[in-house]
């Protein structure tokens, strides 16, 4: 079984090792293989186009409380939202800018600094500085306040309960 197969389509251009995964997939008989994704797209590979497809739907989709905010100061608003959440509960902030993640951390009260982590690619360790972290054992969040960048957007299962703050910057 290959999970998040949509990631293979979008990232195979710059991650050649993903292409070999499909080669291994076809080594298995059709009854012993499957591809899974929540965001199905058409395949360019003719062999994959011939695969059986099953669309699964929720019987009772879970209800989520989603709040939408518009602002001219994303970093300040994000900092405020972090501080409004219960101090014992974990938080994930999805923001594809380490510079802005570090800026938000600076806007938090000093007592929160030790609770912050930036989960990003290995190539950004220096930019993340002392806040750099990876998922803990069992895919648990390493700190209470966790910023994640694009390398964690797909293909990563976080096995923890958390509040989610997603930041979209139209100017970037």
Question: Across the structure, where does each feature detected by a protein language model lie?
Answer:
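Loop/turn-to-beta-strand initiation segments
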Residues: 28-35, 142-146
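Conserved two-lobed SF2 helicase motor
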Residues: 1, 140-155
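Interdomain hinge/linker at the junction between the two RecA-like core domains of SF2 helicases
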Residues: 32, 38-85
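Conserved RecA-like helicase motor core of SF1/SF2 enzymes
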Residues: 150-172
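SF2 helicase catalytic motif II
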Residues: 1-28
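Residues immediately C-terminal
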Residues: 7-10, 41, 154
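Conserved strand-helix element at the start of the C-terminal RecA-like helicase core
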Residues: 81-109
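Conserved helicase motor
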Residues: 97-98, 117-132, 149-153
